[in-house]
C-alpha cells in the first residue's frame, strides 16, 4: 500500500471514530470549591489553630493548605487596604487552585437608605480599589452582595440592584437575598440578563424565608450555608456566634451535596461557603461536604480532628 492510500485509510478511520460509537466526547467537568467564610475567629484558637500561636503563624496560609477557597468576611465591615488584599493574594499562591470570594461592604447592602447617588458611587469606587489586587491576580471568583431578610422584592429594590451591577460591572458579582419574595422566575431571568450569580442559601426557614435551592444564573454557581439554628436566628439578643452555632449532621450534608451536584452541572465554577463558623464548625462542614463530593476522606487539620472525632479517619 502506497503512502497516499495509507493516508486515506487513516483519515477514514478517524472520521468513523468521530461519527460513530468509537468516539465519546468528554463529559463536562466543572470545579467545586468548598471553604469557610472568614479565617480570623478568636474561638478557633485551640480548635483549629494552635493555642498561643505566635505572630509568625499565618492563618490564611494554613486554611489554603486544606481548602481551595475562602470568602473574605472582613470586607463586609470595611473595604480592606489594597496592600492587605495584595498580601492575601501572595499568601495563598502555593495552592494553585485557590480562589477568593468576598463580601461587599455593608454600606452597599445594609445601609443603603442613607446613601445618595454620589455617595453610592464613591462607596463602590472604594470597593473597587480594595479588591483590585486580588482581581488583577485572577483569583477573585465573585464579589457577593449579601442583603438582609428585610430587603424585599420590589421594583425599587430591583432598580437599586441594577445601579450596583452597573457601578461594579468589572467584577463577577453574586447576590444573596434571604426573603422568599425573591424566589420567582422573573428575578432569576433578571440576574441572567445581567450575568450575575444567584447565591443559594441554607438558613433557618422561618416565615417567608427563601429556601435552599440550586439556581444558576451565571457562569458561577454559589451556595452559602448559615446553619439551621432556629432558636437564635431571629433572636435580637443572640450574638453572632449563637446565630451561627450549628453543626450539620450527615443527612443534611448529603442533602446539600445533592443541590451542589445540580449546580455543578449548570455552572462553570461552583463555590460552597460554610458560614457556621463557631468553634470551627464551618471547617468541619466544609470537610464533610468535600468527603461526600469526592467519596474519599480529605486531609484534616489535626486539632480540628481532635475536636470533632468523626473527621479522624
Model-inferred region functions:
Residues 5-6:
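Ser/Thr/Pro/Gly-rich low-complexity, intrinsically disordered segments
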Residues 10-313:
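Residues lining hydrophobic/aromatic ligand-binding pockets adjacent to catalytic sites
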Amino acid at each position: 500500500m502506497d503512502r497516499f492510500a495509507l493516508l486515506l485509510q487513516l483519515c477514514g478511520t478517524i472520521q468513523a471514530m468521530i461519527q460513530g460509537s468509537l468516539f465519546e466526547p468528554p463529559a463536562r467537568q466543572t470545579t467545586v470549591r468548598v471553604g469557610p467564610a472568614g479565617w480570623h475567629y478568636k474561638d478557633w484558637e485551640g480548635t483549629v489553630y494552635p493555642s498561643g500561636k505566635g505572630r509568625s503563624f499565618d492563618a490564611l496560609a494554613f486554611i489554603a493548605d486544606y481548602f481551595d477557597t475562602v470568602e473574605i468576611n472582613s470586607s463586609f465591615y470595611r473595604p480592606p487596604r489594597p496592600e492587605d488584599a495584595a498580601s492575601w493574594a501572595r499568601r495563598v499562591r502555593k495552592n494553585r487552585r485557590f480562589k477568593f470570594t468576598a463580601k461587599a461592604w455593608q454600606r452597599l447592602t445594609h445601609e443603603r437608605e442613607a446613601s445618595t447617588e454620589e455617595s453610592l458611587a464613591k462607596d463602590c469606587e472604594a470597593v473597587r480599589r480594595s479588591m483590585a489586587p486580588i482581581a488583577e491576580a485572577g483569583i477573585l471568583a465573585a464579589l457577593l452582595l449579601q442583603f438582609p431578610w428585610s430587603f424585599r422584592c420590589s421594583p425599587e429594590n430591583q432598580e437599586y440592584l441594577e445601579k450596583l451591577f452597573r457601578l461594579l460591572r468589572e467584577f463577577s458579582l453574586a447576590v444573596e437575598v434571604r426573603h422568599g419574595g425573591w424566589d420567582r422566575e422573573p428575578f432569576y431571568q433578571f440576574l441572567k440578563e445581567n450575568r450575575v450569580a444567584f447565591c443559594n442559601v441554607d438558613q433557618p426557614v422561618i416565615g417567608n424565608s427563601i429556601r435552599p435551592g440550586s439556581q444558576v444564573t451565571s457562569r458561577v454557581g454559589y451556595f452559602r450555608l448559615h446553619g439551621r439554628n432556629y432558636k437564635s436566628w431571629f433572636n435580637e439578643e443572640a450574638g453572632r456566634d449563637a446565630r451561627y452555632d450549628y453543626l450539620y449532621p450527615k443527612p443534611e450534608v448529603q442533602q446539600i451535596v445533592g443541590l451542589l451536584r445540580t449546580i455543578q452541572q449548570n455552572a462553570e465554577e461552583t463555590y460552597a461557603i460554610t458560614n457556621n463558623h463557631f468553634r470551627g464548625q464551618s471547617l468541619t462542614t466544609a470537610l464533610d461536604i468535600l468527603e461526600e463530593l469526592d467519596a474519599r476522606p480529605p486531609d484534616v487539620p489535626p486539632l480540628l480532628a481532635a475536636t470533632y472525632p468523626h473527621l479522624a479517619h
